[in-house]
Amino acid sequence: MRRAVSKIIPNGPPRFLQSGSLLSGDTNFKYRIDFNSVDEFYISLADPHRSWLPGDEISGQIIFISKKDLANIVITLSLIGSVKINASSHSKLRPVKELLFHHTIKIYGDENSGNNNENGEEFSNGLFKGEHRFPFIVKLPNKRVFTSIDFGKGSIKYSLKAAVGNASSFANDSPAASPLSDSNNNNNNTTKNNFISKTKNLNFHNSVYTSEKIITLINPIDVSKLPRSKPKRLIIKDPRLSKKLSRTQSSTSTLNTVNTFNTLSSNNSDTTTNGEFHSNGNTPGNSASQSNSNSPLNGLDNARPQVIKVALEIPERGFLRGELIPTKLNINHSRKIQDLNGIIVTLVRVCRLSNGHENMVESFRKDLQQSVLPLYVDPNTFQSEINTNLRVPADAFPTISGCPLVSFQYFIEVLINLSGKSLILDSSNHHKPSISTDEANHSLLENPSNDLKYKFNFNSNASMNQNERSGFINTDKYKRMKKFLLLTTEVIIGTNRSNERSAYTSNERSNELLHDNLNSISPTSRKSSSVSGSNDSPLLFNQTGSTPPSQQGHQQPMSLNPLSEAIPANNFSTPPYFENQQDSPLNIADTPIPGYEEVSNNYHANSSLAPVQMPTHQHLSEKEQIRAHEASLLPSAPPLDDAEETETISPIDKNNEILENIEESGEEVNQLNNESNDSASSRHSQSFGFFTYQNSTSTTTPTNHESLEEEEEEEEDNLYHSNNLSNSHAEIDSESTDWVPNYETANHDILLENDHVSTGTNMHPGRNANSSARGPQQDNSS
């Protein structure tokens, strides 16, 4: 390298370092890098559009194009990961930036290039004028790596940064090359300190060119390895029970006290209030309460629960983009409730921003999906089970937690109206659409079912489904009300699912639940299920039961286990048809499915009406037989009076006179058509000698030119009257040959008269004779 440099650069003392004058006429100064010496400087990756994982190796090249020969330059490459919080006028957080990691390596140049002057060497390296490429391979770290995202209030960014400059500038800026830390301990490094002090004044002219390449990193989250989420349960006790108990114990007449409180409670509920407070009054001094504990009134009150129990259950903890999150809600209430908008289920993303050491945190909420469900409590069991599902949007990025300044989490929020008073939703309860998004979204995938792995491209300009999300209900108003109950559970949005078998096994488990629930259906069970918005997907049956009329229009069967869209829907089983509803569904696999004939025979055997026999109609054409078969499949007509029965004739009854007349007329037409066809074919066979079914043994040759002209006229006539042959009904046993018109003689065609044009049903055998009248133009047709 030094020999190559010495050929293009003349040897001479570095006077610019000795004199300290920057305006000296030294020739070495022209080989230094400046603003006009670099034409292009950028980073080119081998796979620029790839999303990288922790531990991957990034390969690429640094391309450097110079306008002149350069000497004593250094090219470095840095891998930088940072978290940044932007400044905002309406936020109390100040702008802050924290580095996750910062690693720098030298691509070109000596490690001690700034110390070469003490050895008497003038130049350490140099580059010719032109293009230079420097390949590199960088391995990403495995720790402190979070998913790349750029949102409005901050960003998590990873970049490769290349820099080129003089060796003196890097010696001053690089801690590894700077000897200032050892100057107080070693007195022998005075030469280095003098060199650094001289090059400090050259930083203005030793400009450094930089190029930055943003890379996308994904922190992989395997949702199949996450633990199963625990159900969220909440128990609410009625505070009035304790008041009733104290007043009952202090009352002199227990019976009057019970009647009084039953009257008061009837104004607030639909049924009789619970009277189980007598169970706590079974003391020796309260004999009246014990005597009335077995009364019919107390027996009815004991059947009602004293507390309200709500349980929220989600089968899995992690989901992928595009998957459905099935949600199961069990409610045990103390009275009957019918509310059309009693339950609001929302998929929420919460962003938390902190300001580092000041412990100031700001939270921002965004509703991604929402479903409003009716709440119906069974008056007999005071229970209700609601099944619904929410789809994870395609623009949802993975859960980010553990990051120093930013965190993104997803929650399922369930808001229940337990008061029984219907909620009126108006326009003021909805979010207003906003132009700018608080958090980052990325564009919709064109094919969400394919290549879902590690393909994220988040940006702050996309506003996915902004019009749809603007219609969501703002639940902040109802959270502050006492009559509403709030349940939340966290779900994790991951990047991949290694155990694809779990999605297939949900099909088998759902089939078992289907067979079990077919026997356990009761008319008193009230189970409502709904699907949010347009999130229709091929799910499986998990729960069966009656649904409210308002929700039957968009009901979808559901399963407790989500099914990825990437899995082909070919393992779904359809429940067979049961002729008798009392048949056990457990014997489905053993009993064959009855065919159409068996079902029809069993129906006619058990029915009092005589079945209509299908006529055989061997003499009819195939088209008429198909029409008769279609008519037999039509629904039966209602029974008519005797007077009407004499005038009404079934079109498929073989014994009817009208049908016989129609058949006879059809046979006559067929005979006439067959005779005309036989006569034409016989003349045709006699003139040309073609093989036909009528004359299969003997063939003749044409005798004169007149017979040829007659046959050509007949062929031209068949071109226009060929539709008569298609409408004629031949016998099934006879075989018809295909006929193709001769379009080569179309130039000699003439129009027919009205008498010769036929529809194919009112023909007579003499049509060929009448059609023989042609002009002299047909003489040259041969």
UniProtKB/Swiss-Prot annotation:
Domain of life of the source: Eukaryota
Region (Disordered): 173-194, 234-300, 517-586, 635-654, 693-782
Low complexity bias locations: 181-194, 248-274, 695-704, 720-729
Gene Ontology CC terms, in alphabetical order: cytosol; plasma membrane
Gene Ontology terms for molecular function: protein-macromolecule adaptor activity; ubiquitin protein ligase binding
Polar residues bias spans: 275-297, 517-562, 570-585, 757-782
Biological process annotations from GO: ubiquitin-dependent endocytosis
Composition skew (Acidic residues), residue ranges: 708-717
InterPro entries for this protein: Arrestin-like_C (IPR014752), Arrestin-like_N (IPR011021), Arrestin_C-like (IPR011022), Arrestin_domain-protein (IPR050357)
Residue stretches in coiled coil: none
Ranges of Basic and acidic residues composition bias in the record: 746-756
Family according to the record: Belongs to the arrestin family. PalF/RIM8 subfamily.
Function description: Required for the proteolytic cleavage of the transcription factor RIM101 in response to alkaline ambient pH.
Protein name, as recorded: pH-response regulator protein palF/RIM8
Gene assigned in the entry: RIM8
